[in-house]
């Protein structure tokens, strides 16, 4: 612990952002990260606690507290404070293959469990993580390091999202010959097309993927396994296969008029916009435009927020975000104590931009769509929305959100984006490999393991645990890699945490 009194001497300081009305003019990353001096002050605030919940990744009250990757936060904070940036990078990279991603898109579970934040403000862990990895790139610490010995074993990974990339990175370090198959035209999966460029600049992904290529990992893009290439062909070429295909089956909305023109799933909307941005700087017209339209987003999560920010940048006339659940409290409730994940109101970048542009928060709580209304040409023109309330189901004993009779209202809308979450993996991949699915339509395995019912076929990421965070996908990829390595070699020294 470099400075025992640091948490008393320095206040919390975190990355700033470009002003909302300025940043909506483009799709560039808008965070202004801390200087090294401020990063070192934040590192000095780290208390090196007796029980550092920041790195615990424990499940408390059904939710994760601390980092699922068990990042050695107190250790590398101390190294940052003392100016030993290379060693800080080594400690960070020991548990996290992709800090350049998590330092930009992770909700910072570590900070919510920080002891310093129990009575005061937490350490700016995510900003320091960003500082460590960017310093590593600037000084050559994050250079390619190909394995010195190859095992002769071959592994195919289906999907290049965070779990697939993590598994590939780990297995390649072990010396196995790894090939990653990606159906899209670029590597990255969710990172590339599911997260907008202003949140994660795609050059950051390309930078890391290029290093992985130099380290010997092979990438096959534009190949949809299960359609373009059959599993039987992969079985002949590879000793093991890991399915990292994500949970891309979107949850739909059942309401009259659902077939109206102008209703899209959020993931398709975001994907098309990013593709057009990267291919032509949005000049090819191959995207759904919100320009001049009243936009309604169904869903209050991160994807819904990304849609808010994207629609505003496209020039939407208005943006409304519907959330089924009640508005969370601004502070922790008595039954939600630290170090549990705080169930409190969060105003994200998209909502901040809506407030700046339209003068009000775009969210309407305890509300859903009752009916979509079309014009004579079948185009969406407005919605009927209805308020919801929590009621106990007498049969099950569970509380459910149900419509409030007589609360219907009309809302103008020419574009609706459904961001209601995902139901599980796409069925054609599972059918092609013959893997079993569980009740949640995720690929089934024994608890705590990654082997499927099909010999030599493993699974990791969202198509295993369900829709989740990037940090969880990385952890799944690392754990699956270790299990695959052990099955190939009889033992494994790949670290998981």
Predicted segments with their positions:
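Glycine/serine-rich phosphate-binding loop and adjoining beta1-alpha1 elements at the start
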Residues: 40-56, 62-147, 213, 221, ...
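Feature captures the FAD/FMN-dependent oxidoreductase FAD-binding
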Residues: 87, 149, 154-158, 206-255, ...
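Phosphate-coordination loops involved in phosphoryl transfer and adenosine-cofactor binding
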Residues: 151-154, 222, 291-294, 366, ...
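Glycine-rich Rossmann-fold phosphate-binding loop(s) that bind the pyrophosphate
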Residues: 159-162, 299-301, 462
């Amino acid at each position: 612990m470099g400075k025992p009194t640091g948490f008393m001497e320095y206040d919390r300081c975190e990355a700033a952002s470009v002003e909302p009305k300025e940043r909506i003019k483009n799709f560039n990353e808008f965070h202004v990260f801390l200087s090294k001096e401020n990063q070192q002050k934040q590192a000095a605030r780290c208390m090196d606690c007796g029980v550092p919940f920041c790195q615990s990744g424990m499940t408390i009250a059904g939710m994760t507290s601390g980092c699922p990757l068990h990042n050695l936060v107190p250790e590398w904070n101390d190294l940052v404070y003392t100016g030993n940036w290379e060693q800080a990078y080594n400690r960070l990279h020991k548990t996290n293959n992709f800090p350049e991603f998590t330092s930009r898109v992770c909700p910072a579970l570590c900070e919510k469990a920080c002891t310093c934040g129990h009575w005061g403000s937490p350490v700016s862990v995510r900003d320091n993580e960003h500082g460590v990895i960017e310093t590593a790139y600037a000084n050559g610490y994050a250079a390619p390091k190909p394995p010195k010995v190859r095992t002769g074993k071959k592994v195919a990974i289906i999907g290049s999202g965070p779990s697939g990339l993590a598994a590939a990175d780990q297995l390649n370090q072990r010396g196995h010959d790894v090939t990653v198959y990606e159906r899209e035209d670029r590597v990255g999966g969710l990172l590339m097309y599911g997260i907008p460029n202003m949140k994660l600049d795609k050059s950051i992904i390309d930078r890391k993927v290029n290093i992985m290529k130099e380290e010997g990992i092979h990438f096959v893009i534009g190949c949809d396994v299960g359609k373009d290439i059959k599993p039987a062909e992969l079985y002949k070429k590879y000793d093991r296969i890991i399915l990292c295909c994500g949970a891309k089956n979107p949850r739909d909305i059942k309401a009259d008029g659902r077939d109206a023109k102008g209703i899209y799933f959020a993931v398709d909307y975001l994907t098309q916009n990013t593709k057009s941005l990267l291919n032509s700087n949005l000049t090819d017209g191959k995207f759904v435009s919100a320009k001049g339209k009243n936009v309604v987003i169904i869903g209050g999560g991160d994807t819904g927020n990304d849609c808010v920010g994207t629609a505003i940048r496209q020039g939407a006339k208005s943006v409304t975000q519907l959330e089924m659940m009640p508005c969370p409290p601004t502070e922790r409730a008595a039954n939600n104590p630290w170090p549990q994940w705080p169930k409190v109101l969060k105003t994200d970048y998209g909502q901040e931009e809506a407030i700046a542009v339209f003068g009000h928060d775009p969210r309407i709580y305890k509300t859903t769509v009752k009916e979509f209304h079309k014009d004579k040409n079948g185009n969406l023109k407005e919605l009927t929305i209805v308020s919801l309330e929590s009621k106990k189901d007498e049969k099950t004993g569970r509380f459910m959100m149900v419509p409030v009779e007589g609360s219907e209202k009309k809302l103008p809308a020419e574009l609706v984006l459904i961001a209601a979450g995902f139901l599980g993996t796409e069925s054609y991949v599972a059918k092609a490999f013959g893997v079993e699915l569980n009740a949640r339509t995720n690929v089934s395995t024994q608890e705590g393991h990654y082997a499927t019912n099909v010999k030599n076929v493993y699974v990791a990421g969202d198509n295993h645990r369900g829709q989740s965070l990037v940090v969880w996908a990385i952890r799944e990829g690392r754990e699956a890699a270790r299990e695959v390595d052990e099955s190939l070699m009889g033992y494994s020294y790949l670290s998981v945490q």
